[in-house]
């Protein structure tokens, strides 16, 4: 079907099959090579007259995909590179009507065996084997001018192609529409050659132009998409491949495209973003060119399809429509024309660019209108003042509606308050200082629940009480921070001041107060308005004044010289004045205490020790408290206090001398870390010992104490004492037990005590004379003794001297002053080597009686004796602490609590009873009972000898109406190494007793015999002044069980848990000679600690306060040792 001399390819497959043509596979006409020799290598610019006859001169189909020349010559033509050349099927589809019928032409083109000819050489003149792949230079010379919609098939399936990349390049190469039209199908192809040559010439002239790069970019774009299909940089990479592949072709002409492409991609990855920007810009322009070109092509196709007629020869029918569609490029868009037309396009784009940014600058009319309105409104507000005022009023009303301004009535009320000078001056007193401190110090950790609880408790306080409490807290804080001698004392962040809340029946019950760094909480109620405590430190007095500084009997209470204690007591009953305490010593802090209107004593405990004394109309209750670590005290409902043993660090001895009408000698110093707990209530004498959340055991003092007078020490240690006096019935405190009956006369039995050599003698210089004719009265009708602290026998001790408490305690209540001119004497006899150790003697004193105490260094293992407190007529100890360093008349009870302390818990609403909880460690003081029964007759008319305690165990004695509580009363005696010392409770005169006391003694007698075997553990007497038992964190105290009778309750003795175990099972032991607090008819039930047993090297002294976990006990502790086994041990 070819023209003259034209022959088909050697393979009969080279044919085009139009889908609409009558001939299914018409032969593709090719001109003979002789007619146009340079037509055979279609990829080379000069010889392409024949290729344009079949394909347009711009068609790079075979050139780009197949570097070798196509076999288009006749049979046996010199251009045949090999008979086994590969075949490429090219499908050309055209759609159209009758003029341009839809056609699908398949071109089966063979490929030579990778041979190429030099440009301009005839088909037969092969230069030899060329690179199997098209190099960059070759590709450059055959850039197509147009892309056509011709699809190729078959290259991937070419088996003879040794390198697969050749087949892979076929789909990548963009096919271009290059049909020459009906003119080139005549056979000779001359017109087509003449048409295509100018375009080739133009293309060669602009080979280095951007248009050439654009064509290469079109080719490389598909290649780049294959390697970077997911990358948005495909267009830029295509631009990058143009110069890179060209350079690689020049450096290594033998490098194939597939070898060079990975290198180019790698180079692209190492290119910086800045360098890539050039290629991004180039790709952007190329994309614009492509879009414009596609638009032009579409226009040309539409125009050409309308103006061209189909080819007349039947065999060329399919070519006619094709030509009408795609072969117009050489004629209408020659390369030169394309370059000419592209220039105006660029200028046109440049001309269009300026308007493009102008479009966004156009402001919408709505925005312009809004802007104008805003400007007019702004100008109008400034010009029209009236309008502005109206708007401001509207804004103000709106703000008020939003709640920005409070109610005008509230504003006026605030202004009125601020105008009052008192309101402004008391702001600090009303606002909680600790709360402010917490707010200003974000570093401190504050428990909000504790603060809320404290604030709720404060709701029950009156304004005067609240102001007093705040002032005291502020002064304490200043005192704790200002003095340099306080040895780094700091206030704890726990709730400050002593607070109280009201229970159901309106009575106040104290709750935990301020705690110092080394002190304990002082419980009590703040004194009435107008009272201010005055604390004197270093000679400087700080406000703590009371408008009424008179005692009820009209006598003022001067401050002792050593203490500079200046209590200003209120004249009215139950309204004691605040008590100021001065500490002159080695950096110990004495904190002022506040007195409550109803007799409660409260004070904030600063670091160090604080004396809390409540002076009711007749009573001067004193409370000592030793604390170690400031901790939050468990809720103390009814004046509960924990007694921590006095800290023996430095063996600082402390003597408290309080006199009414006379100066007390002796240096009153509180041991470091100890602080008296606020205890007494209105009209009631009571001492409460509280541990400041530290371990209840005291610091062990010197094991090898050197004998020296107490005066040599910087301060004298004061054992906890209790002064009970005046009306207990008037107690506004909600004690668990109220004292219904008290001993009319209290007499201290002469007790024989031994103390070890090498220990300092205790006592005060001179005899302690209590006001003659005075009897101590804890309640309205009777007086009782509440022993506190370690062992009960706490009289001033001295080597070979006996300390006397000469003055009888005065009973302030008229009906109970039956026993006047009575004295308490404690006689010390025996060998000096046996030192009465760890004795804690509660001192009862009122009004004019003086009291002092000194602390001696006691070895923990020394034998001690128990002092039995009883009533004795005008007995005195002539030599009272001659060696003690306390100046002035002072009685020196001892409390050397070295380790865990025993707990005395009192709890009842009817009668005050003693609740004893014995600590696991025994006391050092030993009482002796020759009879081995360890009991005292109820009336104490005849003295009883107490068997020596094996483990220095002691019992606290509680005075009953006719019986003075004895050491044996609370605990059975244990044999000890020596029995040289025997405590003989004796009563010379006993006044009539209350009927409840008789019943109590009867009950005690019944239970004494059954439980005397278990009385060995008597080293704890703990006084609790709360209606709810305070359970220590480690060892909870069991609640008291109501015993019926007259409403009194039995203070069940609770066993503190051992070092590792929970609290031991208590078992009560009744004692005939023991009364709780001379109060309720119910006898005190003591449950000795089961852990105590014979053979224990040391017994820990008793202390008032919640049982705390002791330091590692140095004795064996069998929590459940029966009395029989203990008895057998004693027999051994």
UniProtKB/Swiss-Prot annotation:
The record marks 5-6 as: Breakpoint for translocation to form BRD4-NUTM1 and BRD3-NUTM1 fusion proteins. Residues 1-56, 337-365, 383-405, 476-584, 693-714, 873-892, 922-1017, 1031-1132 are annotated as: Disordered. Residues 337-352, 1123-1132 have a biased composition (Basic residues). It holds the Pfam family NUT. InterPro entries: NUT (IPR024310), NUT_N (IPR024309). The keyword Phosphoprotein applies. It comes from the Eukaryota. The modification N5-methylglutamine is found at residue 1046. Residues 21-36 have a biased composition (Pro residues). Residues 932-942 have a biased composition (Basic and acidic residues). It is found in: Cytoplasm; Nucleus. Specifically expressed in testis. Belongs to the NUT family. Plays a role in the regulation of proliferation. Regulates TERT expression by modulating SP1 binding to TERT promoter binding sites. PANTHER family: NUT FAMILY MEMBER 1 (PTHR22879:SF13). It is linked to A chromosomal aberration involving NUTM1 is found in a rare, aggressive, and lethal carcinoma arising in midline organs of young people. Translocation t(15;19)(q14;p13) with BRD4 which produces a BRD4-NUTM1 fusion protein. A chromosomal aberration involving NUTM1 is found in a rare, aggressive, and lethal carcinoma arising in midline organs of young people. Translocation t(15;9)(q14;q34) with BRD3 which produces a BRD3-NUTM1 fusion protein. This is NUT family member 1. It comes from Homo sapiens (Human). The gene is NUTM1.
């Amino acid at each position: 079907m070819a023209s003259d001399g034209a022959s088909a390819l050697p393979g009969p497959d080279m044919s085009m099959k139009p889908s609409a043509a009558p001939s299914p596979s018409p032969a593709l006409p090719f001109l003979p090579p002789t007619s146009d020799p340079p037509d055979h290598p279609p990829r080379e610019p000069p010889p392409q007259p024949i290729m344009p006859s079949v394909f347009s001169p711009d068609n790079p189909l075979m050139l780009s995909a197949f570097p070798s020349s196509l076999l288009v010559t006749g049979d046996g033509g010199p251009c045949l590179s090999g008979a086994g050349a590969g075949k490429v099927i090219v499908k050309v589809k055209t759609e159209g009507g009758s003029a341009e019928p839809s056609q699908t032409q398949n071109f089966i083109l063979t490929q030579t065996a990778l041979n190429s000819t030099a440009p301009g050489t005839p088909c037969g003149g092969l230069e030899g084997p060329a690179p199997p792949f098209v190099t960059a230079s070759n590709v450059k010379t055959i850039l197509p001018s147009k892309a056509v919609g011709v699809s190729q098939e078959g290259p991937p399936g070419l088996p003879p192609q040794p390198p697969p990349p050749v087949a892979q390049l076929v789909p990548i190469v963009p096919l271009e529409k290059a049909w020459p039209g009906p003119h080139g199908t005549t056979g000779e192809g001359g017109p087509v050659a003449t048409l295509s040559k100018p375009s080739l010439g133009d293309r060669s002239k602009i080979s280095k132009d951007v248009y050439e790069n654009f064509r290469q970019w079109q080719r490389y774009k598909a290649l780049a998409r294959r390697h970077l299909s997911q990358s948005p940089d495909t267009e830029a990479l295509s631009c990058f491949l143009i110069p890179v592949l060209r350079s690689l072709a020049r450096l290594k002409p033998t490098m194939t495209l597939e070898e060079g492409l990975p290198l180019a991609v790698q180079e692209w990855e190492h290119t910086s973003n800045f360098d890539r920007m050039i290629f991004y810009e180039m790709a952007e322009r190329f994309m614009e060119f492509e879009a414009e070109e596609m638009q032009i092509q579409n226009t040309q196709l539409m125009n050409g399809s309308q103006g061209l007629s189909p080819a007349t020869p039947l065999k060329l029918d399919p070519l006619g429509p094709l030509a009408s569609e795609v072969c117009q490029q050489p004629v209408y868009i020659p390369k030169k024309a394309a370059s000419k037309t592209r220039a105006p396009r660029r200028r046109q784009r440049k001309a269009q660019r300026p308007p493009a940014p102008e479009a966004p600058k156009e402001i919408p009319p709505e925005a312009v209108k809004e802007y104008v309105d805003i400007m007019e409104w702004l100008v109008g507000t400034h010009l029209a003042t009236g309008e502005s005022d109206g708007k401001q009023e509207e804004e103000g009303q709106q703000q008020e509606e939003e709640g920005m301004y409070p109610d005008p009535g509230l504003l006026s009320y605030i202004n009125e308050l601020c105008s009052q000078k008192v309101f402004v001056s008391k702001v600090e007193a009303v606002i909680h200082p600790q709360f402010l401190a917490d707010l200003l110090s974000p570093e401190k950790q504050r428990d909000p629940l504790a603060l809320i609880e404290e604030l709720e408790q404060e709701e029950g306080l009156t304004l005067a009480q609240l102001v007093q409490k705040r002032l005291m807290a502020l002064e304490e804080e200043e005192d704790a921070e200002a003095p340099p001698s306080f040895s780094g004392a700091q206030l704890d962040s726990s709730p400050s001041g002593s607070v109280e809340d009201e229970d159901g029946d309106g009575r106040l019950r104290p709750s935990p107060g301020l705690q110092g760094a080394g002190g304990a909480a002082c419980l009590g109620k703040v004194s009435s308005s107008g009272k201010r405590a005055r604390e004197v430190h270093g000679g400087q007095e700080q406000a703590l004044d009371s408008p009424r500084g008179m005692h009820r009997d009209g006598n003022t209470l001067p401050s002792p010289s050593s203490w500079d204690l200046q209590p200003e007591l209120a004249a009215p009953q139950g309204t004691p004045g605040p008590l100021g305490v001065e500490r002159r010593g080695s950096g110990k802090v004495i904190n002022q205490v506040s007195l409550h209107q109803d007799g409660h004593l409260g004070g904030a405990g600063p670091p160090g020790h604080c004396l809390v004394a409540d002076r009711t109309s007749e009573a001067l209750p004193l409370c000592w408290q030793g604390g170690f670590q400031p901790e939050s005290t468990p809720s103390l409902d009814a004046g509960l206090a924990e007694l921590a043993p006095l800290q023996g660090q430095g063996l600082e001895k402390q003597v408290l001398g309080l006199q009414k009408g006379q100066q007390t000698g002796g240096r009153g110093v509180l041991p470091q870390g100890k602080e008296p707990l606020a205890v007494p209530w209105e009209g009631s004498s009571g001492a409460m010992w509280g541990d400041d959340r530290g371990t209840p055991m005291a610091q062990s003092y010197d094991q090898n104490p050197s004998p020296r007078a107490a005066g040599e020490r910087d301060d004298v240690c004061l054992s906890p004492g209790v002064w009970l006096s005046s009306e207990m019935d008037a107690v506004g405190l909600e004690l668990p037990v109220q004292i219904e009956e008290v001993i009319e006369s209290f007499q201290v039995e002469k007790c024989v005590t031994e103390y070890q050599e090498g220990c300092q003698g205790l006592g005060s210089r001179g005899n302690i004379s209590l006001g003659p004719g005075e009897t101590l009265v804890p309640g309205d009708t009777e007086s009782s003794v509440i022993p506190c602290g370690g062992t009960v026998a706490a009289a001033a001790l001295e080597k070979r001297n006996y300390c006397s408490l000469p003055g009888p305690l005065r009973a302030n209540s008229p009906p109970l002053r039956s026993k006047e001119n009575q004295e308490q004497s404690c006689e010390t006899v025996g060998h000096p080597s046996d030192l009465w150790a760890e004795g804690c003697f509660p001192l009862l004193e009122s009004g004019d009686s003086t009291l002092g105490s000194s602390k001696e260094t006691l070895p923990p293992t020394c034998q001690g004796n128990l002092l039995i407190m009883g009533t004795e007529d005008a007995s005195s100890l002539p030599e009272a602490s001659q060696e003690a360093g306390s100046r002035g008349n002072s009685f020196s009870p001892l409390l050397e609590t070295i380790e865990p302390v025993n707990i005395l818990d009192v709890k009842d609403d009817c009668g005050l009873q003693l609740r004893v909880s014995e600590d696991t460690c025994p006391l050092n003081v030993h009482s002796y009972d020759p009879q081995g029964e360890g009991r005292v007759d109820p009336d104490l008319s005849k003295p009883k000898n107490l068997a020596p305690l094996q483990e220095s165990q002691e019992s606290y004695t509680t005075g009953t109406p006719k019986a003075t509580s004895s050491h044996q009363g609370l605990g059975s005696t244990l044999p000890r190494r020596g029995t040289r010392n025997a405590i003989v409770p004796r009563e010379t005169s006993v006044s009539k007793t209350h009927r409840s006391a008789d019943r109590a003694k009867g009950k005690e007698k019944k239970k004494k015999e059954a439980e005397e075997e278990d009385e060995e553990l008597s080293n704890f007497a703990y006084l609790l002044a709360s209606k709810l038992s305070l359970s220590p964190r480690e060892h909870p105290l069991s609640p008291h069980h109501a015993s019926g009778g007259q409403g009194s309750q039995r203070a069940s003795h609770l066993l503190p848990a051992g070092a590792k175990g929970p609290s031991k099972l208590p078992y009560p032991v009744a004692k005939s000679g023991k009364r709780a607090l001379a109060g309720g008819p119910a006898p005190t039930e003591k449950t000795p600690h089961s852990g105590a047993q014979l053979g224990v090297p040391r017994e820990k002294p008793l202390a008032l306060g919640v049982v705390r976990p002791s330091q590692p006990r140095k004795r064996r502790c069998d929590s459940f040792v029966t009395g029989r086994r203990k008895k057998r041990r004693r027999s051994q």
